[in-house]
Amino acid sequence: MKLIFLHGLGQSAESWKEVQNLLTDYPSEAIELFSSEVNSYQKVKDRVYQHLAQETEPFVLVGLSLGAALALELSSYDLPNLQALVLSGCPLKLAGNILFYIQLLIFKLLPKRVFEKQGADKSLMVGVSEELKTLDLTAIAGSCPYPTLLICGSKDKPNLSSMKALHRLLTNSQFQIIPDGPHILNRAKPKEFAEITRSFLEFLK
């Protein structure tokens, strides 16, 4: 079974390297979501779907943050070889989410150099966040048939409640909290992330 990794906003495919190195007994691929041509959530969704539709072997989608939302949304598409989902720090509903709106406002106010220091692009971060402010995955989660592993860091307070809500909606799901884990678990807690994911993959066999 192949693992296909989807990174978060402000990250790159490289963000999954440590996790991939800890799961080398599974073939894997980390998709670079954004480029100069692919610079919106809708374009990313279309391109990743086209890529996944061409997969010829069974695969599991592993996503963090934006990548998790993308994985969950794509689970409602026609993907015959999709077997399961691993979602980390996944937002469920950003429409009407005051904290997300405040974050978007801060993004708009921060100077470009702050983003550049983090290796991020301000216009991309703001543009994609604008698209996501109407996101509501409640209906998709409620009808998702795939076995799903939900992972959240104990320090990721903004996403803990949405992950608990996802766990209630996803009838075939497991929920694991990583102690002292922040939002960016693929970077901060790769060993723990890989161990939990490995246990889930063994459970699927």
Language-model region placement:
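Conserved HGGG/HGGXW glycine-rich cap/lid loop of the alpha/beta-hydrolase fold
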Residues: 1-37
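Flexible "cap/lid" loop of the alpha/beta hydrolase fold
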Residues: 41, 76, 82-111
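Conserved acidic catalytic loop of the alpha/beta-hydrolase fold
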Residues: 42-59
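Gly/Ala-rich beta-loop-alpha elbow adjacent to hydrolase catalytic centers
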Residues: 63-71
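Hydrophobic, aromatic-rich cap/lid helix
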Residues: 113-139, 155
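Short beta-strand/loop motif that positions the catalytic acidic residue
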Residues: 143-144, 150-152
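Conserved alpha/beta-hydrolase "acid-adjacent" motif
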Residues: 157-163
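Catalytic histidine-centered segment of alpha/beta-hydrolase-like enzymes
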Residues: 181-194
